[in-house]
Amino acid sequence: MEGPNSMEVGSLEVKKNDKDPWSKTAYLGGRLVSKIPAVYSNDNKFVFLTYDTFIGIFSLITGDCINRIFFPNNLANLLPVAVLLSPENAFELYVIFQSGYVCVHDWSNSELLRTMEISTRVHAASFSGKLLFAVTDTPASDSASSQDRFTLYALSPSTSKEGSSILIPTFVSKFNEFLALDSSLRDNNLATVAVITTDKAIFSLNVPKKKRSQRWIHREHLFNMPQKLTNVSLCGSACAVSDDEGKIHVINDISNEKFNPQILHWHANPLNGLSWALNGEYLLSGGQEGVLVLWQMETSHRQFLPRLGSSILSIATSHDSDSYALHLGDNSLVVIRAVDLAEQIHVSGINSFESKYLTSTGPKNTSKQLQGLVQFSSVSPNGELLLMSSSSFNGHSVSVQEYDLTKDSTIRKFEAARYSYSSVSKNSDDATSLDNGHVGSVAVTSSRNGLYIATIDTWCTNIIDEQQRNVKQTALKFWQFDSVQKTWVLMTRIDNPHGNLEVVTALKMMTSSNRFITVGTDATLRIWALLPGSSAWKCVAIHHFANTHSQASIKQRYGFSKALTCSLDDSIIGFGYGSCMHFINSETLEEISTVDLPHGGQLENAQFLNAEHCVIISQRRLLVWNVISASVQWTLASKFTGLLASSSSGNDFAVIDFNSSYSRLIIFSPDSPKIQSIHIFKTLPVALHYLHGGFVVLDNKSIIHVYAGDLTTKIPSAQLSIDNTSRSLLGDFQKRNVPLLNLENPISGSQGLHYKRLTTDMIHNLFNVPSNSPVNMQAIYNTFSKMAVGEPMESLGTQIATLNTE
């Protein structure tokens, strides 16, 4: 064993190349679908899905993405709040952003036709006839004399004297609270708008008047109940309002001065989706139960479409009511035919992992966020597919999906674990509110020949037991691919494979054979193999590496690690325990060597690169171990997440480190600590793999980042910019408050440059060194001249400074 004195801590030094061999490719895989409901084209042949930076246009015949509409790239933080088809031109698509920008595109060719700007924040928008209704913040001058924080405007299209398109605003109403907006046309082609707050619905009806083109009458209905309203949907004069108890309040004619709502109640949880069909003859509803309910309004008869696989977030109905587009909680869209309630198309991206471990929006608590996940993703043996676990129904069901990065879609999915979700908690956004159990984490890996998959699911019967007594149940499952049914079939289930209440901390397939390895908190390493001539899997070898009976405290059990690896020929198995990495012979299970990483924290990951090198990562240290000479090749200190991947040749490997502001993908060679390539993330990386000849990073927003390799997006990623000729104001709408853009020097990226004074304290924080360490500011001035704290790191290219404390 090599002692700590033989370790030399390397500094972050960038290898100077003319070209970065691991540059980011133009790949648009993954991403989360926005909460904005899907939009049908007028001919009902296409559906529009909104993502973070673009709108995807999908064919309702093939389910393929045929085109993308990108948001302008010279404006930062564009958050869309509404995507609407023009009532006058079937090819014009309006995109309204929260910042007040309105972009009009020709969706047939993705051309940006014109842009307009509202000078205040927009919360919601909806078309009714030729009028565009928008809920905005009340202008500062008006809000000073009123407590109403929101204003509803009716915007009518027009043309200015200069010939540019504008929208002329008309004030409709003000209100202090706002939850949802919808609009519709009554039988006489007059507009109706419905706005709901937490306890009342506000209806604005457009009525004709001789001397004025528009006049509005307002009606309010107060719901005298403790439940809060959640959603609203209009169809002509009929209105449906839902509350957080799952009730639907139906008002048949809001034009009447007095009305008594009809109550429809089946859902036990708040409703997310409401939509009318067949001109008000049917009402569709859906929520956390994952069941679509179709209400026949005349008879109140109900029809159910269950087993959708995830909660329903929104519902959209085609213009001819022949199909329904359901946005599901697992980040997918399913279109259902109305005639037989069968699936027409299914657009499935990266299924989200509804877990308390992936809620962080930054890398500050990365290790804590990922601590509960054993290994939720892996790569198929042929290096083509990404295997991932995903949860739904607030952690009550966990599935394994096979994701094809070339098609950017899920090609296969099966349920790996389920805890009864017959009664989903109403406080579904709060994981600690679950008192009836949930699946905590799932590990997944596949055999070398790709015919078998092993999964580990860990679940608890009561959240209080998990938090106070750390009581968990574990199941090891082996699955075989059914070539006829094209799905995975359960072969063997082993409950508590490491003993009662013992948790499996690591799962790994052996490199060259169809065997699996597990490590558990009973301080044993177990090898599992398929019995000859049988469909049953069994433990064939056990290695005891510690005496857990003398370790009574839970604190000492944190020495168990997720680090587990095999050599390329399966002759050596490496596993982590405490601060040490142990290497044993896979046949005799005798110990070969031990590597100690002092002051590095808990071991997070390890991987053999080739026959000579093995990379070991702890929370605060990276070490390259030479297996042949049993010595340290090199090591360096930083804060690491534990994510690790190596190229197929073993000549390069990638890790993720982090600080309080960002994460970095750093690519090394096993021979030297010099950085081959470095890339910055403002999001939280949750998975790192090597596929299709490049390193693939999946972040907590389900965005896939690809570095090198042959993966490219099928759709051209041409970006749009707002220029001076296409920009106009919405008439005189709050013109005095319009923030003008500096069009002489447009922002070239999604972020502007923000410079700050570089201080010694900032350097200490940047490199994670003690605050009393001396820093020679003059000596490092030149290398730090481009690295002001707060500057977007991607602008540095491959230039990175090294801390000099001489």
UniProtKB/Swiss-Prot annotation:
Residue ranges crossing the lipid bilayer per the database entry: none
A GO cellular component annotation in the UniProt record: small-subunit processome
Primary location: nucleus
Subcellular location: Nucleus, Nucleolus
Coiled coil (UniProt feature): none
One GO term (biological process): maturation of SSU-rRNA
PROSITE patterns, per the entry: WD_REPEATS_2 (PS50082), WD_REPEATS_REGION (PS50294)
InterPro entries: Quinoprotein_ADH-like_sf, WD40/YVTN_repeat-like_dom_sf, WD40_repeat_dom_sf, WD40_rpt, WDR75
GO MF annotations, alphabetized: RNA binding; snoRNA binding
Domain of life: Eukaryota
Sequence ranges of the WD repeats: 266-305, 448-489, 499-538, 598-635
Keywords carried by this UniProt record: Nucleus, Repeat, Ribonucleoprotein, Ribosome biogenesis, rRNA processing, Transcription, WD repeat
Annotated function: Involved in nucleolar processing of pre-18S ribosomal RNA. Required for optimal pre-ribosomal RNA transcription by RNA polymerase I together with a subset of U3 proteins required for transcription (t-UTPs).
Subunit structure, as described in the record: Component of the ribosomal small subunit (SSU) processome.
Protein name: U3 small nucleolar RNA-associated protein 17
